[in-house]
Amino acid sequence: MNGRPSVFTSQDYLSDHLWRALNA
């Protein structure tokens, strides 16, 4: 997990993965 702070919510985690997947 890079580019993200140590503390984040599961929603941010999912949103980040979805965004990365869509913009891969």
UniProtKB/Swiss-Prot annotation:
Species of provenance: Neurospora crassa (strain ATCC 24698 / 74-OR23-1A / CBS 708.71 / DSM 1257 / FGSC 987)
Residue ranges the record marks as coiled coil: none
A GO biological process held by the record: translational attenuation
Record-stated family: Belongs to the arginine attenuator peptide family.
Keyword Coiled coil among UniProt keywords: no
UniProt-recorded name of the protein: Arginine attenuator peptide
Keywords per UniProt: Leader peptide
The protein's role, per its UniProt record: Arginine attenuator peptide (AAP) that has a regulatory role in the production of arginine-specific carbamoyl phosphate synthetase. Encoded by an upstream open reading frame (uORF) within the 5'-leader region of arginine-specific carbamoyl phosphate synthetase small chain (arg-2) mRNA, it attenuates the translation of the downstream arg-2 ORF. In the presence of high concentrations of arginine, ribosomes translating the uORF encoding AAP stall at the termination codon, resulting in reduced translation from the downstream arg-2 initiation codon.
Pfam families referenced in this protein's UniProt entry, alphabetically: Leader_CPA1
Recorded superkingdom: Eukaryota
Matches recorded under InterPro entries: Leader_Arg2_CPA1
